[in-house]
Amino acid sequence: MEQKSNYSKKELLIVADEGFDGAGNGKLPMPPMLMVDRILQIIEDGGAFNKGYILAELDIIPDHWFFDCHFKDDPVMPGCLGLDALWQLSGFFLTWIGGEGKGRALGCGEVKFKGQIRPHHEKIIYKIDIRRVIKKPVFMVLANASVQVEDRTIYVAKNLQVGLFTGLIYPPPEGEVEAF
């Protein structure tokens, strides 16, 4: 995939299938776990820390799979899916700047939920400010981010951590537990 400043859903689906470079590096999840419809802006120099910035969106469709099961007669998008979208985008950033490997969420220092996403909402906006990129021993990103709906910030995540790992094998050798 060519490095550019924005990506369509079609392009993100290619990254989910083939990886950013066509060789499997930095694959995004396939639908329905892909929680991003488009990246409107991705830059390496910018954002609150001048280390990078991502602006992306997900269109809300009233029949998204998660509304049927979370919760019956009280549909709410699970907060963990919004958080996963932030990890997905942070991992995308790592391969976008040239990192190689399979992306794995490593943690988050703090998450606050201040609202909820319902089927009647139209769009989710993700904003990610890259705080730091570490290239050795593991290619890794640290970021702060927010999730917005209807111009209101409803999730805030600080110190998101995603790493790229090479040498991960699936399935792992018999009797072994796969680790990073």
Stretches found by the model and what they are:
Residues 1-76, 96, 101, 114-118, ...:
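Non-catalytic linker/capping segments at the edges of enzyme domains
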Residues 73-75, 83-91:
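Compact, glycine-rich, soluble single-domain proteins
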Residues 82, 117-124:
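Short nucleic-acid-contacting surface segments enriched for D/E, G, S/T with interspersed K/R
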Residues 105-110:
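Short, structured beta-strand/loop micro-motifs enriched in basic residues and often containing a Trp
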Residues 124-130:
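Short tryptophan-centered beta-strand motifs in secreted/extracellular beta-sheet-rich domains
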